[in-house]
Amino acid sequence: MSDDIKKQLGAVIDSYKEDLCQMADEIFDLAEISGEEYKTSDILCSYLEKEGFVVERGTGLETAFRATWDNGSDGPVIGILVEYDALEKIGHACGHHLQGPAGIGAAIAVKNCLQDYPCRLVVYGTPAEETLGGKIIMLDKGYMKELDLAFMSHGSPNTSVDEKCMALENFVVTFHGVKSHAAISPEEGRSALDAALLSFHAIEMLREHVKDDTRMHYTIRNAGGPPNVVPDLTVAEYTLRSYSTKYLDEVVERFYNILKGAALMTGTTYEVQRDLPFKSKV
């Protein structure tokens, strides 16, 4: 790309800077979590419509959208992907309030400066990145297949054009035991909480025996009730990551063995909800 076009693109973005920064601040204050980004989605869609994009809302997910502009040619279809969900209880700690304004700014700049270049621009709003993996759902429903190439940005303290991307697997596991009074008849109980705690301990033991880039995290969603009752139900959530999808598959297999062992040791049963996987960078 010539320096002249770069200067033109920069000038357009500078002229929209105040609007884009205000938009980012507004989205930051809303801090809508995954799947509930209704006001945020409307802010982004309305601005794109004002700038001449044709917007289709609810594309695969309620808060997703697809905004298009073309100059009547048969050139390449260029995608710009934006995320905008916040983290539950902490807000926009991952910087997704910046992606929508940044992506819209890029799209407007290209639209204004490349009128004579054959191309079609598509801005995809991809919600629920922090939980469901909105892009995966949209791909499975047939969206984005039109794109010849796609770009996205992510907030960071550094400027880079080549970032790594970890594969991720997320599981919600419900352990089932037998309820009993913890003081009068503990021998009759089978603790679902014990099963979850044993699985946590096993993961800690596993850390020494996996590759350095492996990340394993867990939390208890539902511990089961008061301490004087052997809990018959405990719900735990686990997240596993690696920079290699292939290696993560091996870790997942070992994780399933941990669940089997924890249930066997405690005389409990369990069921697994496995969320859509995120693949590592190709």
Which ranges hold each PLM region?
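Acidic/His- and Gly-rich active-site-bordering loop/insert found
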Residues: 3-118
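Metal-dependent amide/peptide-bond hydrolase catalytic core
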Residues: 4, 197-282
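Active-site oxyanion-binding pockets that recognize sulfate/phosphate
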Residues: 6, 10, 30, 34, ...
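Residue-level signal for inorganic ion chemistry
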Residues: 27, 138, 238
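Conserved short loop/turn motifs at secondary-structure junctions
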Residues: 33, 124-128, 276-281
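Solvent-exposed beta-strand sheet faces enriched in polar/charged residues
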Residues: 58, 81, 124, 219, ...
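Histidine/acidic-residue-rich, glycine-tolerant segments that coordinate divalent metal ions
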Residues: 65-66, 85-93, 97-98, 103-104, ...
